């Protein structure tokens, strides 16, 4: 019989997988011409995994890693979107942007042995 899993070890492993997924997502976005502005920005009770820019577009990116791309897409619920929106507003309050900046909330879904799927305008900020 196996001993019960250590909750802290499981949390560390999950955190490590999340960091790896974010790094892979950032690589995929950079190959598309995006430039990173921030990683793991936290404020106002929310967090944004990546904030990237390409031209006039600023994208607030949620990265989800799951066993399948479909499971990753389902993992972004209304509560997560609301928390991300609060954090995005906090980031915007701290940074001056050009008047013609285009703001988006994107998602990147990561699954094993698959290239990350970038979904622009995944939800409203």
Curated annotation (Swiss-Prot):
Q: Which Pfam families match?
A: UPF0102
- Family annotation (InterPro entries): Restrct_endonuc-II-like, tRNA_endonuc-like_dom_sf, UPF0102_YraN-like
Q: Name one GO molecular function term.
A: nucleic acid binding
Q: Which family does it belong to?
A: Belongs to the UPF0102 family.
This chain belongs to the protein called UPF0102 protein Mpop_0474
Species annotation:
Methylorubrum populi (strain ATCC BAA-705 / NCIMB 13946 / BJ001) (Methylobacterium populi)
């Amino acid at each position: 019989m196996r001993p019960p899993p250590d909750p802290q070890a499981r949390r560390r492993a999950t955190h490590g997988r999340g960091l790896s997924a974010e790094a892979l997502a950032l690589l995929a976005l950079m190959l598309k011409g995006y430039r990173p502005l921030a990683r793991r920005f936290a404020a106002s009770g929310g967090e944004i995994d990546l904030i990237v820019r390409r031209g006039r577009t600023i994208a607030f990116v949620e990265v989800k890693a799951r066993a399948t791309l479909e499971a990753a897409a389902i993992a972004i619920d209304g509560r997560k979107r609301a928390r991300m929106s609060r954090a995005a507003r906090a980031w915007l309050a701290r940074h001056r942007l050009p008047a013609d900046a285009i703001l988006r909330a994107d998602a990147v879904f990561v699954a094993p042995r698959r290239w990350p799927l970038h979904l622009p305008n995944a939800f409203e900020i």
